[in-house]
């Protein structure tokens, strides 16, 4: 099974930059999107063969997630049961016979870390949710998780130490998640690979210079790690400030 996750930074804009052509070439079984900034009624495009599920923010043109899947899930749920996390369209869970898929757009801690406290509470709550799912069946957790976990996951670690997405607090939350029975699929296969990034600032020619961050992930339950066939970062795909990340899973 091929799964793709991509923060499209506005799906309407990405549609004008070849999104449908990308979907045709990717030939994925499941496509997970973050930062769609789109409501379902605005989705005036055709994607034959896929069931489509949307979770939109209360605020128009902000956040949002979507899952496009060839296999119809057994069930689909939105958010994860905590009222303060219900309003930004950040999580979709699709249940399949073999696993739960959780598509997530993790809140950014914002400039001056204005939202760091909320972010850390989110991390604890979603980790609890993932662990609850994992007790029932394996979990595939993907999306823009807005953290570069280790120094190898960011081009310039030193100057970014207290910037959103690379604070010690955020990185420790990722460590705690992975210590709870989950595996970062890319680092499982490529523990020492450098220069592998999924997001680049639009400023300072960052993408041209590959001055990036790896903040987009596929994370799976520990008991799925032997079913990982490949995990990749498609850095050549344009259309957003992020690029797609891919997981091939033998399920």
Model-derived regions: residue spans:
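Active-site-proximal beta-strand elements of phosphoester/diester hydrolases
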Residues: 1-9, 98-110, 142
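Active-site beta-strand termini and strand-to-loop segments that position acidic
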Residues: 70, 94-97, 221-222, 247-251
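Structured beta-strand-rich core segments of catalytic domains in phosphoester-bond hydrolases
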Residues: 37, 43-109
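Active-site beta-strand/loop signature of hydrolases that rely on acidic residues for catalysis
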Residues: 7, 23-41, 101, 130-151, ...
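Surface-exposed cleft-lining segments at the edges of enzyme active sites
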Residues: 81-82, 107-123, 158-162
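N-terminal, active-site-proximal structural segment of metallo-dependent hydrolase catalytic domains
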Residues: 1-47, 51, 57-63, 78
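Metal-dependent phosphoesterases centered on the DNase I-like endonuclease/exonuclease/phosphatase
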Residues: 30, 51, 122-211, 215
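Conserved beta strand-loop-helix elements of the APE1-like EEP
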Residues: 60-75, 204-226
């Amino acid at each position: 099974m091929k799964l793709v996750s991509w923060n499209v930074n506005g799906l309407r804009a990405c549609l004008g930059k070849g999104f449908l052509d990308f979907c045709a070439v990717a030939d994925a079984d499941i496509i997970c999107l973050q930062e769609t900034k789109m409501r379902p009624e605005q989705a005036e495009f055709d994607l034959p063969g896929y069931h489509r599920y949307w979770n939109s923010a209360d605020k128009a043109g902000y956040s949002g997630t979507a899952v496009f899947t060839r296999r119809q899930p057994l069930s689909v749920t939105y958010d994860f049961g905590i009222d303060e996390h219900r309003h930004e369209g950040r999580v979709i869970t699709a249940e399949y016979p073999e696993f739960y898929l959780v598509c997530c757009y993790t809140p950014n801690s914002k400039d001056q870390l204005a939202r760091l406290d909320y972010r850390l509470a989110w991390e604890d709550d979603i980790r609890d949710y993932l662990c609850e799912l994992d007790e029932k069946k394996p979990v595939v957790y993907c999306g823009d998780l807005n953290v570069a976990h280790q120094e190898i996951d960011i081009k310039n670690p030193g100057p970014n130490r207290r910037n959103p997405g690379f604070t010690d607090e955020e990185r420790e939350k990722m460590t705690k998640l992975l210590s709870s029975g989950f595996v970062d699929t890319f680092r499982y296969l490529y523990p020492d690979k450098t220069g592998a990034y999924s997001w680049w600032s639009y400023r300072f020619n960052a993408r041209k210079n590959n001055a990036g961050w790896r903040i987009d992930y596929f994370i799976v339950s520990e008991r799925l790690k032997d079913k990982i066939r490949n995990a990749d970062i498609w850095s050549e795909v344009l259309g957003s400030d992020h690029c797609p990340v891919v997981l091939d899973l033998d399920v």
